[in-house]
Amino acid sequence: MADSKKPAIKKPVPKGDRKANRRGAARLAAVQALYQMDIGGAGINETFAEFESHWIGNEVEGDQYLPAEAAFFRDVVSGVVRDQKKLDPLIDDALAKGWPLARIDAILRAVMRAGAYELEHRKDIPARVVVSEYVDVAHAFVEKDETGMVNAVLDQIARQFREDEFTRG
């Protein structure tokens, strides 16, 4: 995504306020925030303030942004920022040879960093759920081939951090 316009969450606000919907919206917002920080150089506090007051749960430029679990959004964004120097080599190792993370589109870097953070630190969420959720987030921004790369990278990282979840029957 070459331009600096923030990708819109174009799903209608769901009926009810299920935790899964709010977490999915938080993941999408976290990826957008990480992308914005990567491209625009905004700081974490400025980004939190902007997203929480102007984007999450609001209508912006005709698009309705879903309500999100703010604590989860903050955890993912702050965790990625804090652990990025550890997460990036994990992602690099999982990428195909000749495709360093620096060569990957900024939105995909944000997706993979957020997914890798959750896989390492959010053991309360099953690994397969994390991988699936971030593949879904990637679908909002990129073509199917690129979502396959996200799936492969996050699956490899999941097996590294949560091998037991893949060896049980």
Swiss-Prot record:
One of its GO terms (molecular function) is RNA binding. It comes from the Bacteria. Gene3D superfamilies: NusB-like. Residues 1-23 are annotated as: Disordered. GO terms for cellular component: cytosol. One of its GO terms (biological process) is DNA-templated transcription termination. Keywords: RNA-binding, Transcription, Transcription antitermination, Transcription regulation. The keyword Protein biosynthesis does not apply. Involved in transcription antitermination. Required for transcription of ribosomal RNA (rRNA) genes. Binds specifically to the boxA antiterminator sequence of the ribosomal RNA (rrn) operons. Belongs to the NusB family. This is Transcription antitermination protein NusB. The lineage of its organism: Bacteria, Pseudomonadati, Pseudomonadota, Alphaproteobacteria, Hyphomicrobiales. The gene is nusB.
